[in-house]
Regions:
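A short, Lys/Arg-enriched amphipathic alpha-helix followed by its capping loop at the start of a domain
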Residues: 48-55, 97-101, 157
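Short acidic, Gly/Ser-rich segments with clustered Asp/Glu that frequently serve as metal-coordination loops
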Residues: 85-92, 97
Length: 282
């Protein structure tokens, strides 16, 4: 953990005290993002989930959607757990940790990453698309993709599959036709192969520089729920602007707590306002 994140973690207790003192028992709704979790990191992730469960309730994607749509009340601080990209470790985590705890997660899958069988091609795809700053020969050996069998297992055990484009492209760099293909062709593949209807979509990368108005408009025509990488609370929110907090298994519980108490939310206010302006432009 870098120095800034270590320092930031010390704000957890003051922020928690302030929130409890000034906002009382007003419930909060937040979404977590994880990516690959290696076997060496599994115990850390398990400890994070155990710690979070003491103060937060984990919702299923269906419960989360019902709250976002105003059909169910938000009664207490709640979390939705999401995983991005479609790494094979996600199935292992579901089997070993989530399923025994009856925690249901939302897995955003890059459809072009599914069913790559050659290890070299898999590493090349990760380097070219998911982590473009990482050379293919530096991709960790454990970074592999789920296939359709793995995704079917997740569905069978009560989890939800979401769309994450065809190739994990930075949508802001594409024209409308290319954006349409990335979003819709990728989703069509997953729906056809898995026999499901996909309602949830997450932007690749998730930052404001990777998104534009065209990608928002095209995604809105296909999906009810659209997820960003902007940190923030979701208790009163449009379903096309869902905030998420990204974490790693080696993050301390106090760093996680600081973010969930809203320690970085103000940083994203201007970004979120800019994103909302796109929806208002006719």
């Amino acid at each position: 953990m870098d120095l800034k994140r270590i320092i930031f973690s010390y704000f957890y207790h003051p922020l928690r005290f302030i929130n409890k003192s000034y906002f009382g028992n007003r419930p909060r709704l937040r979404v977590l993002i994880y990516h690959d979790i290696s076997e060496d990191e599994e115990s850390n992730f398990s400890a994070q989930i155990a710690w979070l469960s003491k103060s937060w309730k984990f919702l299923s994607p269906e419960q989360f959607s019902s709250i976002i749509d105003g059909k169910s009340p938000l009664k207490r601080d709640s979390l939705l757990l999401t995983f991005d990209d479609g790494f094979i470790s996600n199935r292992r985590i579901a089997e070993r940790i989530l399923n025994p705890l009856s925690i249901k997660a939302l897995f955003f899958v890059v459809s072009g990453f599914v069913s790559i069988k050659n290890k070299k091609l898999c590493s090349n795809f990760i380097s070219d698309n998911i982590y473009p700053d990482l050379k293919s020969n530096k991709v960790p050996k454990g970074w592999k993709n789920m296939d359709l069998v793995d995704l079917s297992y997740l569905i069978k055990t009560g989890h939800t599959i979401g769309a994450h484009t065809l190739s994990h492209a930075k949508l802001s760099k594409l024209n409308k036709k290319q954006i349409y293909k990335e979003i819709n062709f990728g989703t069509n593949f997953l729906e056809d192969k898995l026999g499901i209807k996909i309602k949830h979509f997450a932007y690749p990368f998730g930052n404001i520089s990777s998104i534009n108005q065209d990608s928002l408009m095209i995604a809105k025509k296909r999906f009810r729920y659209i997820y960003t990488g902007f940190r923030g609370d979701n208790s009163i929110l449009e379903p096309w602007a869902i905030r998420r907090d990204a974490f790693q298994p080696n993050d301390s519980k106090y760093l996680i707590g600081t973010f969930l108490e809203g320690g970085a939310d103000a940083i994203y206010k201007k970004i979120i306002n800019h994103y909302h302006q796109w929806e208002n432009i006719t």
